[in-house]
């Protein structure tokens, strides 16, 4: 997204009640499609894959390239779509490829003899006509054929494999098969490099019953795999990309422009029509909002046929209707949330029952509610949860103790965020290189491993509170990562984080003062639930967007962080002055007179 688009979003949706507060308007919390009417035109999946279709077409036309590595996530679904697309690209009239193996069986006095002759028709045993075949699971016999010997008569039977059946055409395989049986890849690579099929014994200690002639194979292979599988294959086969072309089936589609939104809508309507379903404009808009929640980007949404079809069928099954509206998709979304919500509800119950202490009212020095995302192994969902972060300060040798890191309960990214917060604070306040205080920072009642730097803005704020002895509002939770210059940057999971804190506040009772602080750069990630939107609309809950630590300090403390004017009213002094005065006071030591020397 270009800077102009980002600035337009901010200008449109920010409501500035004072110079320091930047509360988002409720319209900013859910994205809206710009299309106003539905088109009768339908679009297929490949109409949204201009890069992949061009790469595949060039690969099919290039006679000297026989291998294409194609990144694809939903391989089973994409294999069917890919095979159909390639068939449409192939010429309608195709020649017969391959050979006919003529087997002269042996007897007790002679060995069997096998010869080849050019295939004349598809009736010949190793004839093919340029078919497009796919096999996401294969072994050496299904892929390369087999040589069978009758146990009694010793007659030989040659059985063609997929490489023979796809001669003159295209064979679609999976990278997972190549990785699990790497010897298949080695033999397939040899076939593609030599354009010849050679027979080998399947048993390492037995030879073939007789000589079997090789024959030429005119074969193209497409290997489908996700990014991890392809990366592993590339590590095992260093020459992979000298042998293969590379392209990607894109899992996400940019809908930044109105014509792209229309293309996406036509694609969804085409998918729905396969199941005799129809969608009105509100349904398309709600589906778009749900996809934005998953991608965390209102300009880039998933176009996975598997995922989109699942959402369509879930809404249709639950509503028992053929024409779907926004209500049906919202109902399906809530049902799925409830279905996956056991651990989330238990966590929230612990907070509400004060088994986990999270304050949502009042003010406390050196304590803030950070926003985090919780993931449990064995579950497909994650959810937002407020985390109480506390800080105690003693004037000492400058050590800032990260209790989580010290006890090996935090990862490297968390440690990085902590160090950036310290460096930023020292730089902004012009403190000496050796900080004149010691501090301990704790994620209270956190018993599992934590990682990520999205709490660095919260850590900075709680350090400032403890140093200045200024209380922090407990009704405002915060997320964001900062750099050493104090700029606030984007984090992930913003929708889950906001909804997690909102749920706790809502169940305790909204006061009209509660809210969250998020980075301004995360506005395009927002696609919040209807409950949050309604609360913001009624001014019961607020979402503040900030660009730097100065705006953050203004919201949290209602003070300037640094000196911005010559005079300040009593009780409104800048935070930096309070911290420096406190450090100076603590640093002063009583002077001794020369008489004290004789008294000691």
Predicted feature locations:
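Short, surface-exposed charged micro-motifs
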Residues: 390
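Short regulatory helix/loop adjacent to the ATP-binding pocket of P-loop NTPases
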Residues: 229-243, 529-535
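Conserved ASCE/P-loop NTPase catalytic core
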Residues: 2-234, 246-257, 261, 265-281, ...
């Amino acid at each position: 997204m270009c800077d102009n688009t980002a600035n337009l979003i901010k200008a449109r949706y920010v409501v500035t009640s004072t110079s320091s507060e930047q509360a988002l308007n409720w319209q900013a919390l859910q994205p809206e499609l710009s299309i106003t009417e539905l088109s009768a035109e339908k679009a297929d999946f490949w109409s949204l894959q201009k890069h992949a279709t061009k790469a595949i077409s060039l690969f099919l036309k290039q006679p000297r390239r026989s291998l294409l590595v194609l990144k694809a996530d939903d391989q089973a679904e994409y294999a069917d779509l890919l095979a159909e697309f390639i068939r449409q690209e192939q010429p309608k009239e195709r020649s017969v490829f391959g050979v006919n193996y003529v087997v002269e069986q042996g007897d007790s006095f002679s060995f069997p003899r096998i010869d080849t002759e050019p295939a004349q028709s598809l009736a010949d045993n190793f004839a093919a006509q340029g078919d497009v075949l796919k096999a996401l699971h294969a072994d050496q016999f299904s892929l390369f054929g087999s040589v069978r010997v009758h146990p009694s008569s010793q007659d030989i039977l040659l059985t063609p494999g997929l490489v023979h059946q796809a001669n003159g055409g295209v064979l679609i395989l999976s990278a997972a098969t190549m990785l699990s049986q790497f010897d298949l890849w080695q033999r397939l690579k040899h076939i593609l490099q030599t354009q010849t099929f050679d027979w080998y014994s399947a048993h390492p200690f037995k030879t073939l019953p007789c000589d079997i002639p090789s024959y030429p194979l005119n074969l193209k292979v497409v290997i489908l795999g996700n990014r991890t599988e392809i990366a592993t294959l590339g590590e095992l086969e260093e020459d992979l990309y000298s042998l293969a072309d590379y392209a990607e089936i894109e899992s996400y589609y940019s809908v930044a422009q109105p014509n792209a939104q229309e293309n996406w809508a036509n694609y969804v309507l085409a998918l729905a029509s396969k199941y005799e379903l129809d969608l009105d404009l509100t349904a398309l808009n709600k589906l778009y909002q749900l996809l934005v929640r998953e991608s965390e980007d209102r300009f880039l949404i998933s176009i996975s046929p598997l995922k989109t079809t699942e959402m369509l069928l879930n809404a249709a099954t639950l509503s028992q209707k053929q024409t779907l509206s926004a209500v049906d998709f919202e109902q399906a979304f809530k049902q799925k949330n409830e279905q996956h919500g056991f651990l989330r509800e238990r966590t929230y119950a612990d907070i509400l029952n004060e088994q986990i202490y999270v304050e949502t009212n009042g003010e406390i020095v050196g304590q803030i509610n950070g926003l985090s995302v919780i993931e449990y192994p064995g579950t497909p969902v994650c959810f937002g949860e407020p985390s109480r972060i506390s800080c105690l300060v003693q004037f000492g040798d400058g050590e800032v103790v990260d209790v989580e890191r010290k006890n090996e309960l935090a990862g490297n990214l968390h440690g990085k965020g902590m160090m950036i917060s310290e460096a930023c604070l020292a730089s902004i306040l012009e403190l000496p290189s050796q900080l004149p205080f010691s501090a301990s920072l704790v994620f209270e009642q956190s018993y599992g491993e934590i990682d990520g730097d999205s709490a660095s803005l919260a850590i900075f704020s709680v350090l400032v509170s403890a140093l200045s002895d200024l209380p922090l509002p407990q009704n405002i939770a915060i997320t964001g990562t900062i750099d050493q210059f104090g700029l606030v940057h984007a984090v992930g999971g913003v929708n889950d984080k906001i909804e997690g804190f909102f749920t706790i506040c809502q169940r305790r009772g909204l006061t009209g003062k509660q809210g969250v602080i998020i980075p301004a750069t995360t506005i395009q990630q927002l696609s919040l639930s209807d409950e949050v939107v309604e609360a913001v609309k009624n001014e019961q809950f607020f979402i503040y967007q900030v660009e730097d630590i100065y705006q953050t300090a203004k919201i949290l403390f209602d003070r300037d962080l640094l000196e911005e004017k010559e005079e300040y009213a009593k009780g409104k002094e800048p935070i930096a002055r309070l911290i420096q005065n406190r450090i100076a006071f603590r640093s002063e030591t009583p002077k001794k007179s020369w008489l004290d020397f004789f008294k000691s």
